Each structure stands twice: as structure tokens, then as C-alpha cells.
Curated annotation (Swiss-Prot):
It comes from Acinetobacter baumannii (strain AB0057). This is Small ribosomal subunit protein bS6. GO terms for cellular component: cytosolic small ribosomal subunit. The keyword DNA repair does not apply. The keyword RNA-binding applies. Keywords: Ribonucleoprotein, Ribosomal protein, RNA-binding, rRNA-binding. GO terms for molecular function: small ribosomal subunit rRNA binding; structural constituent of ribosome. Binds together with bS18 to 16S ribosomal RNA. Pfam families: Ribosomal_S6 (PF01250). The lineage of its organism: Bacteria, Pseudomonadati, Pseudomonadota, Gammaproteobacteria, Moraxellales.
Length: 127
């Protein structure tokens, strides 16, 4: 089995259905004895350029290990799912399990925000 990195851009109106879609794809991979090494939900983000007059999309990143037949099935599911406006599948040499830079920066941003809020609370209590 080979390792692949999959990025999906989901229509922003379908953001609430992303969890169900991802679960369906994960079950498809696991039924074929594949593995999910990394799954990240990047949320809604601005597109670099409009796609079909859409300016934002919900981003999903998956690193999977599966066979070619499973990958072909996934590609077909992506192609015929109207909610997915773009997909990218890249073959990787090995499994990537660490967080992506985008996920790390989001965590750092949340940590800074929490520190800032904590500092504000301490300052308010001191007054």
C-alpha cells in the first residue's frame, strides 16, 4: 500500500455536512484495510481566487495509506460529490503524522489569545 496526502475543498454552504463526508471516506479506507495517519479540519478559509463564483471553502487534509483500487474509488466519490469543489491527491514516500504548519499556527494563535485574555482578567482583578 502507498501513502497519499489528500486535500479537499468543500462548498461553504455544506460545512455542516463535512463531518459526515469525512467519516464516509474514512470508513471506505478502513474497509479496504487502509489507515488514516493524519486528519485535520482547517475550517473555512478564503480562496486565493474564486472557483465557480465561490470565495471561501472548508478545507480538509488527510494523510492515508491505501491501495490503488481504494484511491480510485475515493477519486470517483470526490468527482461526483457536488459539495467538493476541488480535491488534490499527492503520493508521498512515507506516512506523515505530525501536525501541518497551518494547524500548528492555529494552535499558537489560540494559545496567544488565551494568554491575552488571562492577562486582561488579571489586570481587571487587580483594579
Amino acid at each position: 500500500m502507498r501513502h497519499y496526502e489528500i486535500v479537499l475543498l468543500v462548498h461553504p454552504d455544506q460545512s455542516d455536512q463535512v463531518v459526515g463526508m469525512v467519516e464516509r471516506y474514512i470508513s471506505q479506507i478502513k474497509e479496504a484495510d487502509g489507515q488514516i495517519h493524519r486528519l485535520e479540519d482547517w475550517g473555512r478559509r478564503q480562496l486565493a481566487y474564486p472557483i465557480n463564483k465561490i470565495h471561501k471553502a472548508h478545507y480538509i487534509l488527510m494523510n492515508v495509506e491505501c491501495g490503488q483500487s481504494t484511491l480510485d474509488e475515493l477519486e470517483e466519490l470526490f468527482r461526483y460529490n457536488d459539495a467538493i469543489i476541488r480535491n488534490l491527491i499527492i503520493r508521498r514516500e512515507h506516512a506523515i503524522t505530525e501536525e501541518s504548519l497551518l494547524a500548528k499556527s492555529a494552535e499558537e494563535k489560540r494559545a496567544r489569545k488565551a494568554q491575552r485574555e488571562e492577562a486582561q482578567q488579571v489586570a481587571q482583578e487587580a483594579e
